[in-house]
Design a protein with these regions (language model features):
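Positively charged n-region of N-terminal signal peptides that target proteins for export
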Residues: 1-5
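Bacterial N-terminal signal peptides
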Residues: 9-17
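Active-site-proximal substrate-binding groove within the catalytic cores of carbohydrate-active enzymes
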Residues: 42-51, 188-207, 211-216, 265-277, ...
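Aromatic- and acidic-residue-enriched segments that line the glycan-binding/catalytic groove
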Residues: 424, 438-464, 564-575
Length: 763
């Protein structure tokens, strides 16, 4: 009876806490402020926790099925107990400003706690979301959904909105954890943690805070936690180490698709036919046998000899063939290329196998020029329309700062002058890079998966718990263990930077996305925590040793000190598993494929498509969006959209996304080639004339306040520093705020005494 009575005891402990974060604009900083004390009760047999503040009692965690309890110890600072059948120890300890909850495995492989319920939630999914528990669209979206915590949550917390206050759980251990949703009758979710056998850390836990029921308070408490941990590093501090960071201020983000030596516009097609003799065509055919599109190119080389014109599709096929062959180390044939200049002879004399990639491309261009002669311009002018000429046009249009990304570094080797010109114009110029997947069979169009050390595929790839190798992106190849990658990172970066290409920025896929893996390979067993540290180490190496402004995918905040910008927080990859978007090419929602003719933007990035109503509600609708990430990291990490979902990608949402970019201080992201620039320049520049000067000022300050101003949540206000405000009206009606009319579908920017209105386009 005595033991049973112990199990039924409700332990109540007084906890003096900081429970709120009130907005205070003094000195442009978010200030925390003490509120009232709270008490908590816990029932060990069900692990049910209650919190009481100002006479209002709320359940902080739903009860588990009753279980056997042992070793209950109550002290002045807290309470501990064990679940002997679960092989788990539990500790709740009183701290100055929170309740520390720690769960330690003494043998269990996994445990699920807490399960939380509330009228609504504020979750750092991407930038941040407000999720009503009874919302049907969110219920549909979360039905049977399980999210990997480290990957899906941009920051290490979740908040439950109760009737009078919010409960904020800050997660101590972000690894090996999932969040599993239930939706009947309303949304709730459970945090689950696995204790891998290869990991000696057998604990997970939380800090539980009580704070005001608004995003500014929630983000403020978390920001204090980040400061306490020494994890906050501002852009200004990053710029002290590399002044180029400041080039991100007011900078839109562009991916330029100029990955071609020659374009159709470079060629005089009538003259070309006279230069293509049988020997040269035969040589080209040999090179194109291994190309995916080689058969089509070969056919069109032959067909145009019979015609007095060249159709556009034939031009594309022939240009594709040239561009493929120009990348080959076997392109030179001394019997075929006999009329070469002195520079070409000099390059040949160095030994083709010893040439850098940039030198190889220079040689091959010169060889082709010696055959095509006046059918093409001087090699310095090849591809200018989509590279150097485009940069000139962007600068002339008024783009002062810009981040420019290339699909991979070979585009720089094709035209090194383009990289230097971007530098000279004050732009940041970067290449996309990745150390995630590794392929056994090499594909030059996926060169990030090619590594000089060929032993890595067998000796440095990740093994799952069941002994199988973990597949790479798109189920191709394998995943490279990041703890074994740094020598290859150094080799690749040394090679790229030795090619006389003046990159000043770098974009690394995956590393800031929270995609961590345990590796059960006996030769190189690795935990998720070690995986994360290795990813941070290679980003830090590129940042510090190569002096590049580093960005990465998503930008989850474990990487906030390593990166200056990220792509994916604002609009993540939308529903990867939806076949209508990814596989069904007849669907109006099909986003397009990855392939494109050389030098053109792939449909995946340029094709404008609508999204399903459910996804619009979840991913785009401003009524459910919160700037949680910006309230913590606005002047620390610059975040934009995932490159699959650039600013112009979603049909019918272009204007809404512009307004949100202003409200949340987000750089627009565009995919650009000559055709796209000519078509969209007016739209882009009308927007950037407002956005760029605003961002340049706002990004150097904290977001100090955020408010929802209308009942439908379609009018919202954000404040940066002391006196820079944005009021965005996403609705179809004018809205009056403090005697000022904010027009429908507009953003009102108030900078001290200066006011400016941006009207969103009807797109």
């Amino acid at each position: 009876m005595k033991r049973k009575a112990i199990l039924l005891i409700v332990f109540a402990l007084m906890l003096q806490v900081v429970v709120g974060c009130e907005s205070n604009h003094a000195n442009g900083q978010v200030q925390t402020k003490q509120h009232a004390d709270f008490t908590f009760d816990v029932k060990p047999e069900t692990f049910e926790v209650f919190v009481e503040k100002d006479g209002v009692k709320e359940r902080a965690s739903e009860p588990l099925p009753a279980r056997k309890v042992a070793n209950v110890q109550k002290g002045e600072q807290g309470i501990t107990w064990s679940y002997p059948e679960d092989k788990l120890d539990v500790s709740l300890q009183k701290k100055e400003d929170h309740l520390q909850i720690t769960l330690t495995s003494t043998g269990t492989e996994s445990f699920s706690w807490p399960t939380v319920k509330g009228p609504s939630y504020m979750l750092p999914l991407g930038e941040g979301k407000w999720i009503p528990a009874d919302d049907r669209e969110w219920q549909s979206f979360f039905k049977e959904e399980s999210l990997t915590f480290a990957e899906s949550f941009s920051m290490r917390f979740f908040a439950v909105n109760k009737n009078k206050y919010a409960l904020l759980y800050v997660v101590d251990n972000l690894f090996n954890s999932t969040v599993d949703f239930a939706v009947d009758p309303t949304i709730s979710f459970t945090f689950s943690h696995e204790f891998p056998t290869i990991n000696s850390d057998k604990t997970y836990g939380f800090r539980l805070y009580v704070t005001d029921n608004d995003p500014v308070s929630i983000a403020g408490v978390y920001k204090d936690y980040i400061k306490e941990k020494g994890e906050l590093l501002t852009l200004a501090e990053k710029a002290k180490a590399n002044p180029d960071v400041e080039k991100l201020y007011g900078a839109p983000h562009f991916y330029l698709w100029n990955k071609s030596f020659l374009t159709a516009e470079d060629v005089k097609w009538r003259a070309l036919k006279t230069k293509l003799d049988a020997n040269f065509i035969g040589w080209m055919e040999q090179h194109l046998q291994s190309s995916e599109d080689g058969k089509e190119s070969i056919q069109q080389f032959r067909e145009i000899q019979k015609q007095d014109y060249v159709a556009d599709y034939q031009k594309r096929a022939i240009i594709s063939g040239f561009n493929y062959a120009l990348r080959s180390r076997e392109f030179y044939n001394p019997k075929l290329f006999t009329n070469v200049d002195e520079k070409t002879k000099e390059l040949i004399g160095k030994g083709i196998d010893k040439l850098t990639e940039a030198q190889l491309y220079d040689l091959n261009k010169r060889l082709l020029k010696s055959v095509l002669q006046d059918a093409v311009p001087p090699i310095e002018k090849w591809g200018n329309a989509d590279s150097t000429d485009l940069l000139k046009d962007m600068k002339a249009a008024g783009i002062t700062n810009a981040w420019i990304g290339l699909p991979d570094w070979t585009a720089a080797y094709m035209k090194p002058a383009f990289i230097q010109q971007a530098n000279d114009k004050g732009y940041l110029i970067a290449s996309y890079d990745s150390y995630h997947s590794i392929h056994k069979e090499e594909n030059q169009d996926w060169n990030t998966a090619i590594f000089e050390d060929k032993s890595l595929y067998e000796n440095a790839t990740i093994t799952k718990k069941n002994g199988e190798k973990k597949a790479g992106f798109l189920q191709r190849g394998r995943l490279l263990n990041p703890t074994l990658s740094l020598p290859s990172v150094k080799q690749r970066m040394d090679e790229i930077m030795s090619n006389d290409v003046a990159f000043n920025s770098w974009f690394i896929d995956v590393d800031a996305a929270g995609d961590f893996n345990d590796d059960y390979s006996p030769e190189h067993t690795t935990t998720e925590a070690q995986d994360m540290k290795a990813k941070l180490a290679r980003m830090d190496y590129i940042r510090d040793e190569k002096k590049l402004v580093v960005g990465s995918e998503t930008g989850n905040d474990f990487a906030s000190r390593s990166i200056s910008f990220a792509h994916g927080i604002e609009t993540p990859v939308i529903k990867w598993a939806d076949s209508d978007m990814r596989k069904n090419k007849q669907s109006p929602y099909y986003v397009g494929g990855y392939w494109s003719p050389a030098g053109e933007i792939p449909e995946r990035y340029k094709k404008q498509v609508p999204i399903k109503e459910e996804y619009q509600h979840v991913y785009i609708d401003p009524a459910y969006s919160l700037p949680l990430y910006k309230l913590v990291y606005n002047n620390s990490v610059i975040t934009s959209h995932h490159w699959e979902w650039g600013s112009l990608k979603i049909k019918g949402e272009v204007g809404t996304r512009m307004l949100k970019e202003l409200l949340y201080n987000v750089p627009p992201l565009y995919h650009v080639d000559r055709k796209m620039w000519d078509a969209e320049q007016e739209l882009i520049m009308n927007y950037l004339k407002v956005w760029s000067p605003f961002h340049k000022k706002a990004v150097q300050q904290e977001m100090t306040d955020y408010r929802v101003l209308s009942e439908d949540r379609l009018v919202q206000k954000a404040v940066y520093g002391d006196d820079l405000q944005v009021i965005a009206n996403f609705s179809q009606q004018d809205f009056t705020y403090e005697n000022q009319v904010v027009k429908a579908r507009s953003a009102l920017i108030i900078d001290g005494k200066n006011k400016q209105t941006f009207l969103a386009p009807a797109q």
